[in-house]
Amino acid sequence: PLDCPICDQGGECQLQDLAVGYGGSSSRYQEEKRSVIGQEMGPLVSAAEMSRCIHCTRCVRFTEEIAGVQEIGMANRGEFSEIMPFIGKVVETELSGNVIDLCPVGALTSKPFRYDARSWELSRRKTISAHDALGSNLIVQTKDHTVRRVLPLENESINECWIADRDRFSYEGLYHESRLSTPKIKHDGQWYDVDWTTALEDIRKTLDCVIREDDKDAVGIWASPMNTVEELFLTKKLAQALGVSSIDCRLQQQDSRL
């Protein structure tokens, strides 16, 4: 197919694999080719190349049968059929990114990853989602030591072959301009960038001062539920070394036992 060199799905497209494996060297298609205007499906899923759609309705059936919502449908009939979101709406389900994996052609692609890299340029690493207690299995794909894409790793006993948009697209926050990349110390009402040695030494002096003046009960450690098991273990070791017994991770003012 002529679109393959410019299609974002090139190299991992089922239609491309079948065409190369079983297709002829020349096309017998003589009819006028369809040209479909791209649809707006939201900030995560790109439907700019809907002329490639083969109307398999995988995306429609996924949103209805797996996600449990009706946000995508087949409009019109015959050669005028189009896959589109409901009029005046976009795809908002928290599982919307899975339609990208389900699409067997390059009709539905990832907006954040669009034209970022080819599949054969990416290195793959297996990992587990840290965003909730489910522990969805993931494949993190990197290029030039930078995370470029996150895909589901099939595990029938946990997440099957689906992942939430939170797991799929949260990697963008790793390199966001608003994320702190160096420690900061506040002095005279202003924040200043410092190196890690200076920051850790400042923390040590502050803790020593508080413990010396107000006892250990004046110190508490607040861990994040997003931390890994290894990070929480080190947090506990730090608390034991300081003799601190006040440790918590609850961010909401509610009884965690409920």
Where in the sequence are the language-model features?
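Intrinsic disorder at enzyme termini
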Residues: 3-11, 30-32, 160
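Catalytic alpha/large subunits of respiratory electron-transfer oxidoreductases
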Residues: 8, 49-50, 55-56, 60-61, ...
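Extracellular/mature segments of secreted proteins
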Residues: 12-16, 172-173
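Surface-exposed, flexible loop/turn segments at secondary-structure boundaries
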Residues: 12, 80, 227-229
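Ferredoxin-type iron-sulfur electron-transfer modules in oxidoreductases and energy-metabolism complexes
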Residues: 1, 14-51, 61, 66-100, ...
